[in-house]
Amino acid sequence: PPVTFSSFVISLGSSSLMLMGEQLDPNQASIPVNLPQAKEIIDLLSVLEDKTKGNLTSDEQTVLRDMLYALRMKYVTLASPK
């Protein structure tokens, strides 16, 4: 399938989730947790949100907003001292 803005956001988000320890495909080996790299992807998506403001369809906006929310919540949970 062709790459769309939404699929691009989902791909980046999935990478960030995997870097935070999520195993998206049970048939694949998990990768080591790397919170700084996961945060870098979150920051990249945040810049993308700022730079595309007013130029996205409502569906694209929703995908980006929801992905950023999920990633930020997961990151805060993992990065908080226990």
Protein language model annotation of sequence segments:
Residues 1-82:
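Long, contiguous alpha-helical segments
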